[in-house]
């Protein structure tokens, strides 16, 4: 539809004035601006990368990862840090819980020598540090662990029985209002790890669970990932890890509500080899005959754990099968449901 000439002149004049005050590009016609592809950082999980629709978590956005205790929230975040560092990214970890296991992070592939770490005393200090490093323009990824541990200074300085209703929620709301635009401008990804609480007096319909820190994070987050432990993995009667399910409950850059399941092995983190086998079997790329698993003419092993061990040693073969899985799923990256259980028994 053609725009009136007088209106065109008025708009052009306004754009020139805005550019003069706020800088060139402060207001543009969408048709004149090239739509940029959304870059992403891999999560370290093949299934979750596909579920997110763009190959990982989006750059320049706020991400929330939440779930019950020991569900894999910090493990997933450390894998994202490792993947970002592999591509030359600079990462920071704001450890509000004062519980970062450096040795575990190193085993997951994190370059701990170059990881920036802060253990702040208060929520205000944590968020000030977050804002400062983000505005520097030199950081690619920041992880805050966790929202629940961002305790306001007034609460720390007060007596044990004092009530501080809504203090943390107001702190988060204020910080997110300040930081969102800067994150986009600097192309910095911010991940908040969050915990689950039960709603007091919840009756009737709806989930009785909620996350800490108020509602602001729910609105500002471009992606929200709910991660849960769904089973224990056993080998020779020994617990060797957990099976986790991650659900993308909010996604502003691709269709939401997709799910992914993966193994989290004790001391090793997310098992990429386990996902390769699961997706390979589902898509008929990996053949399963009884307990034996094979790819083309090559036997991978008898049983899932043996096949995982072989793929862990043969990276080239693992990469080849991964590529075939991605090609089979297609350019739309429609996530295909996995079997309800992995290929060996769990409890």
UniProtKB/Swiss-Prot annotation:
Originating organism: Helicobacter pylori (strain ATCC 700392 / 26695) (Campylobacter pylori)
Modifications after synthesis and translation: The protein migrates as a 40 kDa protein in strains 69A and NCTC 11637. When overexpressed in E.coli a 38 kDa protein is made which is unable to complement the E.coli deletion mutant. It has been suggested this size difference is due to a post-translational modification.
Keyword terms of this UniProt record: ATP-binding, Cytoplasm, DNA damage, DNA recombination, DNA repair, DNA-binding, Nucleotide-binding, SOS response
Family the entry assigns: Belongs to the RecA family.
Keyword Cytoplasm carried by entry: yes
The organism's place on the tree of life at top rank: Bacteria
Signal sequence segment: none
Gene3D superfamilies xrefs: P-loop containing nucleotide triphosphate hydrolases
GO annotation, cellular component aspect: cytoplasm
An annotated GO BP: SOS response
Protein name per UniProt: Protein RecA
Molecular function, one GO term: ATP-dependent DNA damage sensor activity
Outcome of substituting residue 232 to T: In strain: 69A
Statement: the UniProt record of this protein carries the keyword Plastid: no
Subcellular location: Cytoplasm
SUPFAM superfamilies per the UniProt record, alphabetical: P-loop containing nucleoside triphosphate hydrolases, RecA protein, C-terminal domain
């Amino acid at each position: 539809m053609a725009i009136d000439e007088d209106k065109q002149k008025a708009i052009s004049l306004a754009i020139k004035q805005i550019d003069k005050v706020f800088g060139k590009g402060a207001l543009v016609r969408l048709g004149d601006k090239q739509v940029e592809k959304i870059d992403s950082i891999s999560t370290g999980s093949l299934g979750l990368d596909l579920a997110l629709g763009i190959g990982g978590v989006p750059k320049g956005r706020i991400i929330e990862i939440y779930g019950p205790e020991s569900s894999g929230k910090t493990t997933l975040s450390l894998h994202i840090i490792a993947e970002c560092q592999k591509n030359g990214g600079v990462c920071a970890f704001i450890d509000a819980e004062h519980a970062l296991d450096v040795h575990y992070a190193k085993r997951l592939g994190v370059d701990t020598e170059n990881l920036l770490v802060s253990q702040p005393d208060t929520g205000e200090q944590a968020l000030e540090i977050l804002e400062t490093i983000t505005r520097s323009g030199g950081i690619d990824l920041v992880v805050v662990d966790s929202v629940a541990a961002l305790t306001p200074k007034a609460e720390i300085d007060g007596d044990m029985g004092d009530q501080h209703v809504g203090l943390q929620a107001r702190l988060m709301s204020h910080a997110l209002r300040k930081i969102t635009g800067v994150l986009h401008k600097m192309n910095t990804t911010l991940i908040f790890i969050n915990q689950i609480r039960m709603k007091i007096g919840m009756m009737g319909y709806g989930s009785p669970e909620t996350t800490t820190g108020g509602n602001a994070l729910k609105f500002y987050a471009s992606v929200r990932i709910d991660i849960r432990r769904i089973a224990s993995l056993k080998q020779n009667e020994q617990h060797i890890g957990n099976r986790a399910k991650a659900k993308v409950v909010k996604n502003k850059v691709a269709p939401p509500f997709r799910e992914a399941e993966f193994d989290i092995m004790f001391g090793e983190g997310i098992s990429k080899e386990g996902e390769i086998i699961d997706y390979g079997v589902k898509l008929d790329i990996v053949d399963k005959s009884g307990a034996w698993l094979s790819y083309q003419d090559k036997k991978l092993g008898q049983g899932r754990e043996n096949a995982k061990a072989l793929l862990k040693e043969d990276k080239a073969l693992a990469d080849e099968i991964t590529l075939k899985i991605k090609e089979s799923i297609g350019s739309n990256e429609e996530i295909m449901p996995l079997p309800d259980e992995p290929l060996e028994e769990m409890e």
